[in-house]
Every structure is written in structure tokens, then in C-alpha cells.
Amino acid sequence: MTKKFFYVAVVAIAIAALFGVSRPGHSAKKPAAAIPMNSSDIAGVVTSSKGPEAGVWVIAETKDLGTGYRKIVVTDDQGRYLVPDLPKANYTLWVRGYGLVDSAKVQAAPGKPLDLKAVIAPSAKEAAQYYPAAYWYSLLHIPPKSDFPGTGPNGNGISDNVKEQGQWVELVKTDGCESCHQIGDKATREIPSSLGAFDTTAAAWDRRIQSAQVGGNMVTTANRMGRKRAMQEYADWTDRVKAGELPPAPPRPQGLERNIVITQWDWAGPKEYFHDEISVDRRNVNSNPNGLVYGVHEDSSDFMTVLDPVKNTFSQIAIPYKPGTPMAEPEQVLEPSPYWGKEPVAISHATAHSLMMDSQGRIWTAAATRGRENPAFCKEGSNHPSAKVFPIASSSRQTNVYDPKTKQWTLVDMCSSSQHLMFAEDANNTLWFSDPGGDKVGWLNTKMWDATHDAEKSQGWTPFVLDTNGNGKRDDYVEPDQPIDPSKDKRIKVGFYAVGPSPADGSIWGTTLGFPGAVVRLNPGSDPTKTALAEIYEVPWNNPKASVQGFSPRGMDIDRNGVIWTVLASGHFASFDRRKCKGPLNGPTATGQHCPEGWTLYRTPGPSFKGVDERVGSADTNYYNWVDQYDTFGLGKNIPIATANGTDALEALDPATGKFIVMRVPYPMGFFAKSMDGRIDDPKAGWKGKGLWSTYATRTPWHLEGGKGTTSKAVKFQLRPDPLAD
């Protein structure tokens, strides 16, 4: 069944959920000195001309430590706040909240009470400047359903490959521009004067998408949509925003959302962006207590950045690669950037995408270690068991491992490409790799590799083969472009984007991108190269047998019960429970749309696009998700959490109620996560011993609030029992 979202409002003293902009109460102001605090805290009351301000943020920032540092809390229903456990330093504090403009910045030190004066926004326009990007992006007009299929550049401007409105939505969201950065922030909803002068806004947009080293990628995305119509729609949006059209107001934090404490550290340089971070062995959330946090920079640099959250410092470690490893991005810009001109700022060969920590505290990354041509043992004619079944001529990324104890890297040559990676909970500590551009899945037996350092012997891969003859074992198969043969199995041409071993039964799951997209299950069997069997479950779309409709998964994770969680470009957080399937899971009819009953969709928070199909959810973009299997945050076990890339947030879902808790990062605006994990530093320390870790991961940190020169931040989220807990 479809479950509509609610912004969670569960408070220890029980207040009801509120929607729309919260209106501050006028309860009696409690003196700041009466709020219990210690020498490392700052506490007080926030009031405006209308009285105490509930559900607004208090930001404490300092540059006195080893790197830029800030802590952010939310006021309670009486406007009271407490910023806990601040390192000794001088801080700047101010108030930010919906319906307000930023207050004057005040200097303060821990241990002293401080009341703050909030400022009511003089106009709706000024208030809206603090709204998340997706609220502005929701003003974009989506072409009506009657305009699809597209008729090409000489027709209605929509590509004739875009058959329906949902595909257009997919491309304006996660599988297009917003796989890299927000659309709707100030940097994108306006046209910078530095871009040049143009006769029309559509011409300005057409020039804008050609900027920098990735101009070719942006043009390709526009062409997939239909460049002519895409530029017209974006120009219309920009013109309406310039003329004064405003988005709806987001709600202020409510209930448990007011108990969230956010800590940030600046890390890396202004030209570097992050893709993923890791703080812990995901299989043991008590590992690496208070330890270093690691992040990698994909196409922007050849470093791994390391945060020490105890010392409040960061450092960088060069990632090695062999001579001949190509650059990840073109060495020349397509057209000058309005920020960097002709300078190519993305300089990377390793293009390290994702990383995982193992039980020894080592860091494994999906990174390029060499040129694209595979060694002979991967190819046709090799005696490698996997190459005999499915030879591979080339790969774009391989893997490497960094040992913090020895401070040494080791390159591990892989045949199957890597993008995301995940350890299984098995005796071999098997590391599984996704390969979204391929049609196979690869793995590394790290126990064997540790014993032998023989990459050839320790790895394997397999194609995806459906058991279409239904006999429960893998047989000879027909190819993807061949019709089903009832006596054989069938290979399907899919590639995992996300990848994850199920803790429930050891099966391997992944998402496959596209429209409507799918999740795929792989049962490895006793000899995965020869025995692995796949099952494919498409997201229900235009399926009359389905009670829910959605499309285009991207990120994915699995709970301890084996339930799959994935975020959809249709504006939903979805679960897939294979145990709910009523029909055959294999055989000639099990080709994708055969288990709609396994899917449950939850509409994500925020407004919808203008003119969109009523089945489509919010305009927000959700890139990835993670399941808090072990209650590292404080909401309980098996809580799925999505990145809310257009609304500066993480969103935790309670599956029992269908309600979301929105963990908004209000400053600097532009929080755009692609990964997260959770760690328990001290199981006896209550909320202070727990926390979620993530990072700003936009490819364009110069689009963040503060503009050019602003760096990415590591972000820790904690949930205390009430807004004044110390």
C-alpha cells in the first residue's frame, strides 16, 4: 500500500505534528541563566518581535581550531536552546529559521549564557532565500503528459526517446543533473552575470550547460531529454523566479527533529568534492571508536582525506596508481566556467568513488589503479574460471587497500569494474563490487587475498542469468537479445549501481538504473561463477496489477530481515520484501513486473513539480540510502535513512508509521550527501556515544552558500532526548 509521508512530531512531552511554517508561541520567557548548562555549553533563549521562536536553528561557528568547526541545534517550544560540548574556542552565534532572516552575529565563549534576538523576515521574498533548493525547483514546469512521446527537435523539442512524462522526471532529477549537484539553489535558479550577455534566457541556459570540464556530460544529459525543450523549460523557470514567483514555505523542525545536534568540520580544498565517506566497519558499528573518518574525491583529486574528530584536524593521503592511468575528466574545459574560467579544476586519475572499512581497520576503495585494458587472465582464452564463462576485456576502476597502521597502499587488480563496494558477513570477508556500466558482478575473497596477495586467484565474477526454465539450477542460457527458450535459462544485460549482501540469507542485491529500473537478487550458490542465479524485480509502473507506482531506483541498502530499501526518482522511498511475492520467483513469467505486491512506497517530504503526474511524489532528489541496522542514531534498529539531496537533509523513516524525521542541515545551504554510516563510540554514553556520519558531496562546492572558496564539510548527526539535553 502507498503510505503518505508526515513530518514527524513526536515529543517527549507530547505535542502534535504541525505542517506549514511553525508559528512561534508566546509562552513566558525563561531566563537564560535558568537553563542547566556546563562550562563547555552555550545556552539561552531566542526571541523575536513576536516572542519566543520555536523550531529555529542556533549556529555556533569557530575558526580557532585545527579546521573550520560548527555546531547547530534547534530551539524548543519555548525558544530555548543549548549547544553542548563545544571545544574551547571563541564562537560566532546566530539564529536562522524559516520565516526569519539571519540574526546579527554575536561573539561568545562556552560556559556563559547567551540570549539571541531573531529577526522576522521583512518579506516573503527575503524569507524564501533560506528555503532548500527543491522547494525552488518544484516551480519547474514539467511538460504535460500529452506532449509524450517526444517528437524531436523539429517537433515539440522533447527527444523521441522519451516516451512518457515519468522518463522526463527521471532525467530532471536523480538520473540527470541532480546525480551531481542541486538544482534550485541560488547558484542554479539564477543566471550569473559572469556567464555573459544573451538574447534569451534559453540561450543563457544552453551556454551554461557547456561550462567547465563536464560541459560535455551536461550537454549529453540535455540531449537525452531533448535539448531544445529542456532549455525552454529551465529558462521559463528562471524567468518566473526572477519575476518574483516564490515556492511554498517548508515547515520548521518539529518533535524529534528539534533534538538533533549537528557537528561539522571543514575538510579538503575548495576545488575538491567528496563522493563517499566511511567511519566504521559497517558489520561492527562498535569498531573504530572515536577514530578517524575517511573520504574520497572521485574525479576531483587523487587524495583520500582523513578527519580526526577528536583533534579537530584533517590531513590528506595521496592515492597511488600506475603509469598510464588516464585522467577521469577532460584536460580542457568545453567552455569557460563562470567560477574558474578556463582552469580545469578536476584533476584525478584514481577517481576513487567509494570506500569501506574492514575488520582490521583498513580502507578499501573503488579506484582506478591502471589503464582500462585488462590483464590477460581476465580475457578470452584465459584459464581463469570466471574468464572461461564470461571474459572481460577492460575495466574502468579496480580496487586498492590502505593500512593505517603501516600507512601503505596496496593495489589490487580486478577484472570487473568497481563503483560501490560492500563486505559480506561470511567467513571469507568477501568484498562485492558494483559495475553499473557492465553486465556482471565481481567479488574479491579478501581472506584468500590476505593469505596469498594473489589477486588473480582471489577474485571472480559472473553474469546475471535468470532461471527461466524454472528447474532451480543454472543451465545453458540464451543471450539478452534472443527470445526465451523454455529449455534454457536467459542472461540479462543489467549492471548493479548499488550493491549489498543480505544479512538474512547471503544473497547479493543491487539496483539497476533506468526507467522504470529494478532491484536484482543474485543467489551465488556453491560456485558463483557457474551456479549464481539472478532474479529481477522492476519497480511497478503502468502495471494495472500494482497498488503502487514508481520508477528509477538508485541507492540501496538492506535491513537485518532481508528487506530491500531503495530511493526512487519518482519521489519515493521504497521497500521491496521478496517474502510477500505470491507468484513464481523464477520461470518464464518471472521477468520483472511479476511481484508488484513486494513493493511499498513512501512519498518523500516536500512539494511536487508543477503539472506532474499525480503518481509522482516530491520534487526532492534522493541519491542514496542506508539502513541503521544496529541503532547507531537512536531511533531504533533497522531504520532506513535516505539522502534528501534537494532539501539539505537526511530523512529517517519509521516503517511502522510511514512518518519521516527530517534532519535538515541549515548551514551552509547546499548539503548534498551521497553516503552515510553510523558508529557507536561508547555504548555506555547514551546519545553522546552514538552518531551518523556523512559529508557534503556535491560536485560543485562553489555552489554552496558562501560561493567560490567554500569547502566541503564532514557532518555528524546526533539525537539527544530533548532539545536542552547536555
What residues fall within each predicted segment?
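Short, conserved, GDST-rich strand-edge loop motifs in beta-rich repeat architectures
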Residues: K186-S194, G295-E298, T365-S396, P436-F464, ...
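A short, solvent-exposed loop/turn motif at the edges and junctions
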Residues: T62-G68, N90, W94-G111
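Structural signature of eukaryotic scaffold interfaces centered on beta-propeller domains
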Residues: A268-P289, K342-Q360, H420-N428, P486-D505, ...
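The canonical Cys-X-X-Cys-His
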Residues: T174-D185
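Beta-strand-rich domain onsets/edges
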Residues: G20-D41, V45-G51
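Short, ordered, surface-exposed loop/turn motifs in non-cytosolic proteins
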Residues: S40, S48-D64, K88, Y137-P153
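Conserved beta-propeller blade signature
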Residues: L292-V296, R362-A366, N428-S434, S507-T511, ...
